[in-house]
C-alpha cells in the first residue's frame, strides 16, 4: 500500500508594485484625514464649539453653521420618512403572512 503523505498546496506568488501600493496608501490617508477634518467641523457645529481651528476650517471650506444645521435637519426628516416607510412595509408583510396562514 501507498503511505499517505501531506497534500501539496500551491504557493501564492505575489509581486506588489511598490509605487502603486505607496500611491494607494497615500491617497487613502489623504481621504481619511479629510474625513476626520469634516467630522470635527460637523461635531464642532452641532455642539456649538467655538474653537479657532474649527472656525478656520469652516471658513476655508466656505461653510456656515446654518448650512450644516440645515443639512442635518433635512437628513433627519428623510431618516424619519424612511423609518416610517420601512416600518409600515414590515407591518404589511406580517399582516399578509398572518392572513395566509
UniProtKB/Swiss-Prot annotation:
The chain crosses the membrane at residues 23-43, 72-92. GO terms for cellular component: plasma membrane. It is found in: Cell membrane. The keyword Cell inner membrane does not apply. The keyword Repeat does not apply. Its main location: membrane. Keywords: Cell membrane, Membrane, Transmembrane, Transmembrane helix. It is a multi-pass membrane protein. It comes from the Bacteria. Signal peptide: none annotated. Disruption phenotype: Deletion of the icaADBCR genes leads to the inability to form biofilms, produce PIA or mediate N-acetylglucosaminyltransferase activity in vitro. Necessary for the synthesis of poly-beta-1,6-N-acetyl-D-glucosamine (PNAG, also referred to as PIA), a biofilm adhesin polysaccharide. Is required for full IcaA N-acetylglucosaminyltransferase activity. Belongs to the IcaD family. This is Poly-beta-1,6-N-acetyl-D-glucosamine synthesis protein IcaD. It comes from Staphylococcus aureus (strain NCTC 8325 / PS 47).
Amino acid at each position: 500500500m501507498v503511505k499517505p503523505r501531506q497534500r501539496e498546496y500551491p504557493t501564492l506568488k505575489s509581486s506588489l508594485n511598490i509605487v502603486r501600493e505607496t500611491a494607494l496608501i497615500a491617497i487613502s490617508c489623504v481621504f481619511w484625514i479629510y474625513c476626520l477634518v469634516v467630522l470635527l467641523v460637523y461635531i464642532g457645529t452641532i455642539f456649538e464649539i467655538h474653537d479657532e481651528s474649527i472656525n478656520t476650517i469652516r471658513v476655508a471650506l466656505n461653510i456656515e453653521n446654518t448650512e450644516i444645521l440645515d443639512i442635518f435637519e433635512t437628513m433627519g426628516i428623510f431618516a424619519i420618512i424612511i423609518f416610517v416607510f420601512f416600518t409600515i412595509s414590515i407591518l404589511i408583510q406580517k399582516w399578509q403572512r398572518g392572513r395566509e396562514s
